[in-house]
Amino acid sequence: MLTPIIRKFQYGQHTVTIETGMMARQATAAVMVSMDDTAVFVTVVGQKKAKPGQSFFPLTVNYQERTYAAGRIPGSFFRREGRPSEGETLTSRLIDRPIRPLFPDSFLNEVQVIATVVSVNPQINPDIVALIGASAALSLSGIPFNGPIGAARVGFINDQYVLNPTTDELKESRLDLVVAGTAGAVLMVESEADILSEDQMLGAVVFGHEQQQVVIENINALVAEAGKPKWDWHAEPVNEALHARVAELAAARLGDAYRITEKQERYTQVDAIKADVTEALLAQDDTLDAAEIQDILGSVEKDVVRSRVLRGEPRIDGREKDMIRGLDVRTGVLPRTHGSALFTRGETQALVTATLGTARDAQNIDELMGERTDSFLLHYNFPPYSVGETGMVGSPKRREIGHGRLAKRGVLAVMPSPSEFPYTVRVVSEITESNGSSSMASVCGASLALMDAGVPIKAAVAGIAMGLVKEDENFVVLSDILGDEDHLGDMDFKVAGSRDGITALQMDIKIEGITREIMQVALNQAKGARLHILGVMEQAISTPRGDISEFAPRIYTMKINPEKIKDVIGKGGSVIRALTDETGTTIEIEDDGTIKIAATDGDKAKHAIRRIEEITAEIEVNRIYAGKVTRIVDFGAFVAIGGGKEGLVHISQIADKRVDKVTDYLQMGQEVPVKVIEVDRQGRIRLSMKEATTPDAEAPAPEAAE
């Protein structure tokens, strides 16, 4: 008899249920977590032994959405789920980031977390549910894990923080922030904001962390009731004698190497020192393990860099703690792109382009939460040459997808609305050099490229990456961190925004004990750095260009009676196809009668507008039109008039005398004046040639069919 153990609690406006012991009993641990009909099944499997020679912690997190969760069948050819979507990849990273620092440093056993969305309420995003599930499953598993963690989404509506807002509430929110952490510390923040102040952002982080304590308390209670025994795992004892010997041989030399400001030269010197020390020690004692020596060298290297920062000495590249690397900002660097910029900050460089397209270029995204269209795309590419390496080039990896989304969050708040700027915009950031903070360089480059393209963004935005080195109560916050400072430090803290406030905030914290005071210092220091960068950017381009590129499509908007849409489209799309071929434009029609005409040539667009006006013009009875014979039948002829509308000239209306054969008077393609004598209820048009040729007849209408 399967007997589940269930924990249920109120979490803000939602009810959360955590259930274990019912499913996947061969996994190390498994839980089903639900929040108001959104349910995620999370499993954890950990290997009891590490693989021989394992040098890193092999943690994998897979978040996967099943379409049956929303009562749908996949639309793919094979009618089953395929490779992870961008959203699934981002949520996998969201789960990975706060749990990874909570495993012991020397724990190298393989661990896999799989979160499967099995039921979805469109109002409840599964990501928070999956985070809670991963925390609960790891805590129940007995695997060495310094959790549990809680997770919360925070909105900001009517100047009030809202815990776990629904999908509809998020549409009204000026903030979408996810925070995760243990009982005593924030570990991860991911957010986008509509230009909020530093205090408002910090308040949201603290609010979310306080509110998620109920999650941690309930997971602890569940572990007390159903948790598996803790693994009998102990870290390998540190060889203190070897550590001292390595430090004696390497510390001073590594200290000198870390005074070399150029990255590649520094890396070459550090590698040479490590090779020399390893070789020397193995020559003295060939029973030593080279891998262990390398690990200790890494630890010594970290101690050297961190201790110098804490003593207030200059950083690796000679800067003070709050200094920004040298900036070089250029726009319009590529002649045929719609907008381009080259942003360089020290040894980090991004070549960023902006491309304008029409509504049909927008991305249609079919998600579990529903379908949507995205008219602002930002893609980030990190080729291996950017760090002087060789490697695979192909589809974007998890890191590239995550960095691209962060850069997009930084820019999204200043993008114009579709009514203000009816273009699809694609920004691509090519990282050509990297030594820290390439995602924030992408934010700066995106802002510049958009202004160069003439996109009327509300304000320029810039991004900065902050770091932290902390020992006991002593801490130093670093501005514009290098790659090494990111790797050897305790926090990666990225902030993007305009002069007026923050648009995106991302934090990844590797240690506990990050207080509100430390986060406040980091945010204020980041603001100073952001304003400095914006000042330099404004010297290159301070406002969006007054006009878009000559190579970009120009979009003209007109409005017609919605009842006339069928006339513009024509049977099977025949009219609109003929129009686009004839005018060389792209034409998009919306349900409310709005028509968008895109063309690189203004004259072509005007021609298309004129033709649409002809097609949608009301046919006036008793008016004379210039027409063209399109079909001849026994009882008369069909004649196209204004805008391609077709009417019938009955055989009795061709001439004043009796007509025996229509072809005696008319030929296919012949142009003739006709008078509208009736439009019936079905819209059928009766025409007359003989009334159009009477002495008192008016001249044909000038806007007749061409």
From Swiss-Prot:
Cofactors named for this entry: Mg(2+)
Gene Ontology terms: cellular component: cytosol
Residue span(s) of domain S1 motif: 622-690
Positions contributing to Mg(2+) binding: D486, D492
E.C. no: 2.7.7.8
TM region positions: none
Family matches, as HAMAP family: PNPase (MF_01595)
PANTHER family per the UniProt record, alphabetical: POLYRIBONUCLEOTIDE NUCLEOTIDYLTRANSFERASE, POLYRIBONUCLEOTIDE NUCLEOTIDYLTRANSFERASE 1, MITOCHONDRIAL
Name of the molecule in the record: Polyribonucleotide nucleotidyltransferase
Organism: Yersinia enterocolitica serotype O:8 / biotype 1B (strain NCTC 13174 / 8081)
Encoding gene, per UniProt annotation: pnp
